[in-house]
Amino acid sequence: MSEDPNAQGNSRRWIVRAVEDSLRRLGTDHIDLYQVHRPDANTDLDDTLSALSDLVHQGKVRYLGSSTFPAETIVEAQWTAERRGHERFRVEQPPYSLFVRGIEASVLPTCERYGLGVIPWSPLNGGFLTGRYRPGEAPPATGRAARMPQRFDPERPGVARKLDLIP
């Protein structure tokens, strides 16, 4: 939501700025669920959780979540929150569809173990499961297929096999 290419990451500075900007744009005094999208290798998880906890204690955020976190990072976040007295993640938002099921082996059991809800994203696999992409037909020149042509190229053998499964 920013023109600043450096306005990213999970540091206190950017999280607080993002929440304040969202509250202003939404014209509200709190966010029900604030999710951290993807781990940030440049920011210590304790720093991220500390910033998020402060926002919860200030009443600006009600609940915290993670998105696209691997199981081991979810565990680390839960342990860090418990050890340091931070608010913990309550939900995880992983990619999940008939074709993307990797979370079943580790992320889902981890969420169950730690009592996290799961809010899957991309259940239609980025439009792939809609029947929009067909062998012998070029994908649309705009949108997701244009940004990630290797993923949606119906002539690639792996993609074509998947498309054959879609009615």
Where are these regions (language model features)?
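Active-site groove signature of glycoside hydrolases
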Residues: 23-42
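Short, basic/glycine-rich phosphate-binding loops at helix/coil junctions
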Residues: 1-2, 30, 141-145
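Beta/alpha (TIM)-barrel catalytic core signal, keyed to glycine-rich beta->alpha loops juxtaposed to Asp/Glu
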Residues: 43-167
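Active-site mouth loops of central-metabolism enzymes
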Residues: 1-16, 37-43
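Flexible loop residues that form catalytic
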Residues: 20, 36-39, 69, 97
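Short, acidic/polar
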Residues: 9-26, 74-79
